[in-house]
Amino acid sequence: SRDVVNIVRKIYKTKKVGHAGTLDPNATGVLPIAIGNATKIVEYIQSMGKCYVGEMTLGIETDTLDTEGTILKKETKVISKEDITKALKYFEKTYNSKEVYLDKNQFFEVIKEYDNKKISQIPPMYSALKKNGKRLYEYARLGIEVEREKREAEIYSLIILNFYDNKIRFEVNCSKGTYIRSLFNDIASDTDNFAYMSSLCRSKYGIFKIENAFSLERLKNFNENQLYNSLMKIEDVFEYERIDFDKKYFKHISNG
């Protein structure tokens, strides 16, 4: 996310650039960028809800809970529920070994415990959260694990989009401060499996939608007029009703 800010500074030729909501290195999607006076409303933007489409891969666990990390555990085979119903021996083999048993019904039951619920999460060690003035990932890179307090988050909706092989795709609508990597890890654990987040795309951040976003590659090819037109007005970010009033009341309203 910091790299994106630095690139935008060069494109728009200004130092006053900020962003809302850090994206993981392997994640794609919406990253709201604020330029000039708009940096004053970053805190407001960060309070908005988010929507992600993510993929969980069962049978692999990494130290970062995503594709960036070192593999800690790996299973050699994934057996689906359909395979098990075809032959009892597959069920027996799955039960007695560490191979992954993908029971779709079990996942749907577990999802109910997260859907439209407030949850508590322990932030992953590989995250930008600070502890004693240092980022957690800085401790993690030194092989130091520090105690992390649970953080509250809210899952507005959690939908399974599809199953394929040992992978499950989800759509998650959630509050700020939600760690999707940790969510996937918890869901897998609740089904007696382990997994990692194999892909993640933030499709929406408050009023900002991916279909209206500009890629860095596209911005780099914009002329000055196109760059200006790519920016939203600050007042358009706020989801408040517009009220027009007489000029004589301006001072009173400004002073509260």
Model segments located where?
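Catalytic/RNA-binding core of pseudouridine synthases
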Residues: 1-256
